[in-house]
């Protein structure tokens, strides 16, 4: 399908950057666990602004133009980036550890790395496969991050991501 062709173009053009973005996410997440300083918390919020902005601009605006609704998806992810920017300046989400959902958080953190394996199991190879810096991966990582540090979280981010996930889930049945 055209969706997978666009996905392949995105992966071919950005794979090196995706590796750097993923490595930065791993380092910043690790920093939140081991040394949750104010710098680490603000750095994670800056990263989330960048990551969601990347999905909005690079993924949807630059590589998903064939989708008639790509502007809507770009706006949606842009709003999430703005919500993280607002959070950066207000300090609303303090990133305080909550070990209550450890198992679920572990599963959610693993999912961005499982997506390529699941794509491969479906017979897709690079560059057609889902990677760690795509909307599904970013959504599950963000939900995992907010659950892991959920003493107080930005509910708007969660509502937006859950709404997107419910709608996007249907594409599993549409695109084969």
Q: Where are the language model's segments positioned?
A:
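Aromatic-anchored segments of alpha-helical transmembrane domains
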Residues: 50-58, 108-119, 161-173
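Membrane-interfacial loop-to-transmembrane alpha-helix junctions, especially the N-terminal start
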Residues: 39-49, 98-105, 150-161
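Short, small-residue-biased leader/transition segments that mark boundaries at the very start
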Residues: 3-4
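N-terminal signal-anchor/start-transfer transmembrane helix
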Residues: 20-35
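Membrane-helix boundary connector in multi-pass membrane proteins
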Residues: 62-66, 147-159, 165-176
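Hydrophobic/aromatic-rich structural module bridging two neighboring secondary-structure elements via a short loop
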Residues: 38-86
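Hydrophobic alpha-helical transmembrane segments
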Residues: 9-24, 94-95, 148-155
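Membrane-proximal helix-loop-helix units in multi-pass membrane proteins
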Residues: 67-142
């Amino acid at each position: 399908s055209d969706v997978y062709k666009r996905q392949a173009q995105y992966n071919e053009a950005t794979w090196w950057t995706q590796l750097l973005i993923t490595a930065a996410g791993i380092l910043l997440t690790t920093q939140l666990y081991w040394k949750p300083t104010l710098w680490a918390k603000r750095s994670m919020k800056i990263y989330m602004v960048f990551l969601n902005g990347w999905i909005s601009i690079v993924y949807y605006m630059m590589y998903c133009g064939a989708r008639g609704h790509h502007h809507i998806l770009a706006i949606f992810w842009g709003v999430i980036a703005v919500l993280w920017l607002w959070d950066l300046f207000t300090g609303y989400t303090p990133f305080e550890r909550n070990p209550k959902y450890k198992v679920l958080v572990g599963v959610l953190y693993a999912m961005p790395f499982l997506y390529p394996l699941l794509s491969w199991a479906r017979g897709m190879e690079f560059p057609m496969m889902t990677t760690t810096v795509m909307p599904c991966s970013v959504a599950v990582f963000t939900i995992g991050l907010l659950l892991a540090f959920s003493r107080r979280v930005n509910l708007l981010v969660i509502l937006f991501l859950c709404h997107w996930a419910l709608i996007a889930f249907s594409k599993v049945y549409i695109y084969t």
